[in-house]
Amino acid sequence: GRDPRFYKTVLCNGDTWMNSTIQSYEGGKDGAGTTGATTTGYYLKKYMNETVSLAPSNEKKKPHHFIIFRYAEILLNYAEAMDAWKDADYTDNDHPLSARAALNQVRAAADMPAITTSGDAFTESVRRERRVELAFEDHRFWDIRRWKIGDKTKAIYLSLIHI
């Protein structure tokens, strides 16, 4: 099945939100062609407060709280740095936590299996974990720049632009 974080991050067809079933299929009340509807079939759910209505007719009395920095980000930053400096399993007296242990703490919190790969495959696992765990938290742009992989990702983003 899918990574359980997917369902905590987005709403998709058939999900319930604010006591209403999402109908993002073509012809559905939330589908393409409906004013303000999704064009992808998905809506962002991460960090949204279901008790706050954004309808223009409702008063906004409850605030949305957006998290700036999370422990998962600290662990992923550490895993990336340790892997780049030494390797996935390096530890010493000053660095008792390995990159693998840090990465797998994040995965365990999401009920995902541990990563056992090494070398370039481990580096790719760290990068994928950042993409999934930190989705919609404004990290991806900076990750792409830091990793210097813009040439590999450019085609993905350009395919989404219709002028």
Give, region by region, the residue ranges found by the protein language model.
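Acidic/polar-rich alpha-helix caps and helix-coil junctions
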Residues: 1-161
